Amino acid sequence: MNTRSYSTFTPGTRDKSLSSFDGKVKSHPQKKLTSGQHRCGKGRNNSGIITIRHRGGGHKRLYRQIDFRRSEKNNILGKIVTIESDPNRSAYICLVHYRDGQKTYILHPRGIMIGDTILSGPRAPISMGNALPLTNIPLGTTIHNVEVQVGKGGQLARAAGAVAELIAKEGRLTTLRLPSGEVRLISENCLATIGQVGNVKWKNRTLSKAGSKRWLGKRPEVRGVVMNAVDHPHGGGEGRAPIGRKKPLTPWGYSALGKKSRKRNKYSDVSILRRRK
Protein backbone atom coordinates (compact mmCIF):
# COMPACT_ATOMS: atom_id res chain seq x y z
CA MET A 1 0.00 0.00 0.00
CA ASN A 2 1.38 3.37 -1.03
CA THR A 3 0.14 6.94 -0.97
CA ARG A 4 -0.09 8.67 -4.32
CA SER A 5 0.56 12.42 -4.27
CA TYR A 6 -0.82 14.55 -7.09
CA SER A 7 0.94 17.45 -8.80
CA THR A 8 -0.81 20.80 -9.03
CA PHE A 9 -2.35 20.35 -12.47
CA THR A 10 -5.45 22.20 -11.29
CA PRO A 11 -6.41 23.88 -8.01
CA GLY A 12 -8.37 20.72 -7.16
CA THR A 13 -5.24 18.54 -7.19
CA ARG A 14 -3.13 20.87 -5.03
CA ASP A 15 -1.96 18.98 -1.91
CA LYS A 16 -4.10 15.99 -2.93
CA SER A 17 -2.98 12.52 -1.86
CA LEU A 18 -4.86 9.22 -1.93
CA SER A 19 -3.95 5.65 -1.05
CA SER A 20 -3.01 3.51 -4.04
CA PHE A 21 -2.53 -0.23 -4.46
CA ASP A 22 -0.79 -1.69 -7.51
CA GLY A 23 -2.51 -5.07 -7.11
CA LYS A 24 -6.00 -3.58 -7.28
CA VAL A 25 -8.03 -4.50 -10.35
CA LYS A 26 -10.35 -1.93 -11.88
CA SER A 27 -13.36 -4.05 -12.70
CA HIS A 28 -17.11 -3.69 -12.55
CA PRO A 29 -18.64 -5.29 -9.44
CA GLN A 30 -20.45 -8.60 -9.75
CA LYS A 31 -24.04 -7.80 -10.66
CA LYS A 32 -25.49 -10.58 -8.49
CA LEU A 33 -23.51 -9.32 -5.50
CA THR A 34 -24.70 -5.71 -5.73
CA SER A 35 -27.96 -4.02 -4.88
CA GLY A 36 -29.33 -0.52 -4.91
CA GLN A 37 -29.60 1.29 -1.62
CA HIS A 38 -32.05 4.01 -0.67
CA ARG A 39 -30.11 6.39 1.52
CA CYS A 40 -33.06 7.53 3.58
CA GLY A 41 -33.28 11.25 4.07
CA LYS A 42 -29.54 12.01 4.30
CA GLY A 43 -29.58 12.65 8.06
CA ARG A 44 -33.35 13.24 8.36
CA ASN A 45 -35.94 11.20 10.22
CA ASN A 46 -39.35 10.09 8.95
CA SER A 47 -40.69 13.62 9.52
CA GLY A 48 -37.94 15.24 7.46
CA ILE A 49 -36.31 16.81 10.52
CA ILE A 50 -32.50 16.86 10.72
CA THR A 51 -31.34 14.33 13.31
CA ILE A 52 -27.70 14.10 12.15
CA ARG A 53 -26.14 17.34 10.98
CA HIS A 54 -23.68 17.82 8.12
CA ARG A 55 -25.07 15.07 5.89
CA GLY A 56 -26.63 15.32 2.45
CA GLY A 57 -25.97 14.88 -1.24
CA GLY A 58 -23.19 12.53 -2.27
CA HIS A 59 -22.68 10.30 -5.27
CA LYS A 60 -25.03 7.42 -5.93
CA ARG A 61 -23.62 4.05 -4.88
CA LEU A 62 -24.27 0.39 -5.44
CA TYR A 63 -24.07 -1.63 -2.26
CA ARG A 64 -21.64 -4.59 -2.41
CA GLN A 65 -22.91 -7.56 -0.41
CA ILE A 66 -19.99 -8.56 1.82
CA ASP A 67 -19.75 -12.00 3.42
CA PHE A 68 -19.04 -11.11 7.05
CA ARG A 69 -20.13 -14.53 8.34
CA ARG A 70 -17.67 -16.80 6.53
CA SER A 71 -19.25 -19.76 8.39
CA GLU A 72 -21.41 -20.81 5.43
CA LYS A 73 -18.27 -21.79 3.49
CA ASN A 74 -16.59 -24.03 6.05
CA ASN A 75 -13.92 -26.33 4.60
CA ILE A 76 -14.51 -25.04 1.03
CA LEU A 77 -11.39 -23.64 -0.62
CA GLY A 78 -11.75 -20.18 -2.15
CA LYS A 79 -9.50 -18.30 -4.59
CA ILE A 80 -8.96 -14.53 -4.65
CA VAL A 81 -9.89 -13.31 -8.14
CA THR A 82 -10.02 -9.51 -7.85
CA ILE A 83 -9.20 -6.75 -5.37
CA GLU A 84 -11.59 -3.83 -5.77
CA SER A 85 -12.50 -0.51 -4.21
CA ASP A 86 -15.80 -0.20 -2.37
CA PRO A 87 -17.39 3.27 -2.16
CA ASN A 88 -19.33 2.21 0.95
CA ARG A 89 -16.30 1.55 3.17
CA SER A 90 -12.67 2.54 3.64
CA ALA A 91 -11.29 -1.00 3.17
CA TYR A 92 -10.78 -2.76 -0.16
CA ILE A 93 -12.79 -5.89 -0.93
CA CYS A 94 -11.88 -9.19 -2.62
CA LEU A 95 -13.97 -11.29 -4.96
CA VAL A 96 -13.64 -14.96 -3.97
CA HIS A 97 -14.45 -17.93 -6.22
CA TYR A 98 -15.20 -21.06 -4.17
CA ARG A 99 -14.84 -24.60 -5.43
CA ASP A 100 -18.57 -25.17 -5.19
CA GLY A 101 -19.07 -22.45 -7.82
CA GLN A 102 -20.32 -19.67 -5.55
CA LYS A 103 -18.83 -16.17 -5.55
CA THR A 104 -18.70 -13.81 -2.58
CA TYR A 105 -17.02 -10.59 -1.50
CA ILE A 106 -14.87 -10.43 1.64
CA LEU A 107 -12.80 -7.69 3.23
CA HIS A 108 -9.29 -7.51 1.80
CA PRO A 109 -6.72 -8.71 4.37
CA ARG A 110 -3.37 -6.94 4.24
CA GLY A 111 -0.87 -8.92 2.18
CA ILE A 112 -3.40 -11.03 0.26
CA MET A 113 -2.80 -10.99 -3.49
CA ILE A 114 -4.76 -12.19 -6.51
CA GLY A 115 -4.42 -15.96 -6.88
CA ASP A 116 -4.07 -16.68 -3.16
CA THR A 117 -6.43 -19.18 -1.52
CA ILE A 118 -8.44 -18.86 1.69
CA LEU A 119 -10.30 -21.30 3.91
CA SER A 120 -12.87 -21.10 6.70
CA GLY A 121 -13.61 -23.52 9.52
CA PRO A 122 -12.18 -24.88 12.79
CA ARG A 123 -9.49 -26.89 10.98
CA ALA A 124 -8.27 -24.07 8.72
CA PRO A 125 -4.55 -23.26 9.04
CA ILE A 126 -3.41 -20.08 10.79
CA SER A 127 -2.66 -18.05 7.68
CA MET A 128 -3.67 -14.70 6.24
CA GLY A 129 -7.35 -14.42 5.30
CA ASN A 130 -8.52 -17.67 6.90
CA ALA A 131 -11.49 -17.55 9.30
CA LEU A 132 -11.50 -19.66 12.47
CA PRO A 133 -13.24 -19.76 15.86
CA LEU A 134 -11.34 -17.79 18.49
CA THR A 135 -10.72 -20.97 20.50
CA ASN A 136 -8.55 -22.32 17.66
CA ILE A 137 -6.47 -19.14 17.23
CA PRO A 138 -3.15 -18.87 19.15
CA LEU A 139 -2.60 -16.08 21.65
CA GLY A 140 -0.99 -12.94 20.25
CA THR A 141 -2.46 -13.44 16.78
CA THR A 142 -3.68 -10.34 14.95
CA ILE A 143 -7.25 -10.68 13.70
CA HIS A 144 -10.07 -8.66 12.15
CA ASN A 145 -13.77 -9.01 11.26
CA VAL A 146 -14.57 -10.41 14.71
CA GLU A 147 -18.03 -11.65 15.65
CA VAL A 148 -19.73 -10.41 18.83
CA GLN A 149 -22.51 -13.01 18.72
CA VAL A 150 -21.99 -16.50 17.33
CA GLY A 151 -23.26 -16.77 13.76
CA LYS A 152 -24.22 -13.11 13.42
CA GLY A 153 -21.20 -12.16 11.32
CA GLY A 154 -18.16 -10.00 11.95
CA GLN A 155 -18.85 -6.62 13.54
CA LEU A 156 -15.52 -5.53 15.07
CA ALA A 157 -12.29 -4.37 13.38
CA ARG A 158 -13.61 -3.95 9.83
CA ALA A 159 -12.29 -0.50 8.81
CA ALA A 160 -9.18 0.07 6.69
CA GLY A 161 -6.05 -0.85 8.67
CA ALA A 162 -8.06 -2.13 11.65
CA VAL A 163 -6.59 -4.96 13.69
CA ALA A 164 -7.50 -6.65 16.98
CA GLU A 165 -5.31 -8.89 19.13
CA LEU A 166 -6.18 -12.07 21.00
CA ILE A 167 -4.52 -11.67 24.40
CA ALA A 168 -6.09 -14.30 26.71
CA LYS A 169 -8.36 -17.33 26.96
CA GLU A 170 -10.25 -18.40 30.06
CA GLY A 171 -13.04 -20.94 30.14
CA ARG A 172 -15.50 -20.31 27.32
CA LEU A 173 -14.43 -16.69 26.89
CA THR A 174 -11.52 -15.01 25.15
CA THR A 175 -10.08 -11.56 25.76
CA LEU A 176 -9.47 -9.21 22.83
CA ARG A 177 -7.74 -5.85 22.54
CA LEU A 178 -9.70 -3.85 19.96
CA PRO A 179 -8.39 -1.06 17.69
CA SER A 180 -9.88 1.58 20.02
CA GLY A 181 -7.84 0.25 22.95
CA GLU A 182 -10.89 -1.35 24.56
CA VAL A 183 -10.34 -4.76 26.15
CA ARG A 184 -13.43 -6.96 26.15
CA LEU A 185 -14.62 -10.56 26.45
CA ILE A 186 -15.89 -12.50 23.43
CA SER A 187 -17.22 -16.06 23.24
CA GLU A 188 -14.62 -18.62 22.14
CA ASN A 189 -17.01 -19.87 19.42
CA CYS A 190 -17.12 -16.53 17.59
CA LEU A 191 -15.33 -16.41 14.24
CA ALA A 192 -12.49 -14.06 13.36
CA THR A 193 -10.30 -13.62 10.28
CA ILE A 194 -6.52 -13.86 10.55
CA GLY A 195 -4.52 -10.72 9.74
CA GLN A 196 -5.06 -7.00 9.42
CA VAL A 197 -7.52 -5.21 7.15
CA GLY A 198 -5.79 -3.81 4.07
CA ASN A 199 -5.53 -0.22 2.78
CA VAL A 200 -3.56 0.75 5.89
CA LYS A 201 -2.58 4.21 4.62
CA TRP A 202 -6.16 5.29 4.00
CA LYS A 203 -5.96 7.56 7.06
CA ASN A 204 -3.14 9.55 5.40
CA ARG A 205 -5.24 10.70 2.44
CA THR A 206 -5.80 14.41 1.76
CA LEU A 207 -8.95 15.32 -0.15
CA SER A 208 -7.68 18.85 -0.98
CA LYS A 209 -11.01 20.43 -1.93
CA ALA A 210 -14.52 20.88 -0.60
CA GLY A 211 -16.09 19.06 -3.54
CA SER A 212 -14.40 15.81 -2.55
CA LYS A 213 -16.24 15.96 0.77
CA ARG A 214 -19.54 16.66 -0.98
CA TRP A 215 -19.07 13.55 -3.16
CA LEU A 216 -18.91 11.57 0.09
CA GLY A 217 -22.23 13.02 1.26
CA LYS A 218 -20.70 15.35 3.87
CA ARG A 219 -21.91 18.94 4.12
CA PRO A 220 -20.00 21.90 5.61
CA GLU A 221 -19.67 22.23 9.39
CA VAL A 222 -20.41 25.72 10.71
CA ARG A 223 -18.66 26.75 13.95
CA GLY A 224 -20.93 27.70 16.80
CA VAL A 225 -18.96 30.88 17.58
CA VAL A 226 -20.02 32.43 14.25
CA MET A 227 -23.72 31.67 14.77
CA ASN A 228 -26.36 33.84 16.40
CA ALA A 229 -27.00 33.42 20.10
CA VAL A 230 -30.37 31.82 19.35
CA ASP A 231 -28.71 29.05 17.34
CA HIS A 232 -25.78 28.01 19.55
CA PRO A 233 -24.49 28.57 23.11
CA HIS A 234 -21.23 29.94 21.64
CA GLY A 235 -23.03 32.39 19.34
CA GLY A 236 -23.71 36.10 19.59
CA GLY A 237 -21.51 39.01 20.62
CA GLU A 238 -19.98 41.88 18.69
CA GLY A 239 -17.37 40.89 16.12
CA ARG A 240 -15.01 38.12 17.14
CA ALA A 241 -16.28 37.36 20.62
CA PRO A 242 -15.23 34.50 22.94
CA ILE A 243 -17.70 31.75 23.68
CA GLY A 244 -18.54 33.31 27.05
CA ARG A 245 -18.62 29.97 28.87
CA LYS A 246 -16.35 28.08 31.23
CA LYS A 247 -16.08 25.23 28.75
CA PRO A 248 -17.30 24.42 25.22
CA LEU A 249 -20.88 23.21 24.82
CA THR A 250 -22.79 21.33 22.14
CA PRO A 251 -25.60 23.09 20.20
CA TRP A 252 -28.03 21.58 22.75
CA GLY A 253 -26.17 22.87 25.82
CA TYR A 254 -24.38 19.69 26.90
CA SER A 255 -20.68 19.58 27.76
CA ALA A 256 -18.68 19.09 24.56
CA LEU A 257 -15.37 17.83 25.97
CA GLY A 258 -14.83 14.76 28.14
CA LYS A 259 -18.44 13.99 29.02
CA LYS A 260 -19.27 10.31 28.62
CA SER A 261 -22.08 9.76 26.15
CA ARG A 262 -22.38 5.98 26.46
CA LYS A 263 -25.74 4.68 27.70
CA ARG A 264 -25.72 3.69 31.37
CA ASN A 265 -26.26 0.07 32.41
CA LYS A 266 -25.86 -1.20 28.87
CA TYR A 267 -26.10 -4.96 28.48
CA SER A 268 -22.53 -5.24 27.18
CA ASP A 269 -20.94 -3.45 30.16
CA VAL A 270 -20.17 -6.80 31.82
CA SER A 271 -18.09 -7.82 28.79
CA ILE A 272 -15.87 -4.72 28.80
CA LEU A 273 -12.80 -5.11 31.01
CA ARG A 274 -11.22 -1.77 30.07
CA ARG A 275 -12.89 1.14 28.33
CA ARG A 276 -11.49 2.56 25.11
CA LYS A 277 -8.91 5.33 25.29
UniProtKB/Swiss-Prot annotation:
Organism from which the protein derives: Cryptomeria japonica (Japanese cedar)
Gene assigned in the entry: rpl2
One of the record's GO molecular function terms: transferase activity
Range of residues in the leader sequence: none
PROSITE patterns: RIBOSOMAL_L2
Name of protein: Large ribosomal subunit protein uL2c
Transmembrane region(s): none
Keywords for this protein: Chloroplast, Plastid, Ribonucleoprotein, Ribosomal protein
Similarity comment text for this entry: Belongs to the universal ribosomal protein uL2 family.
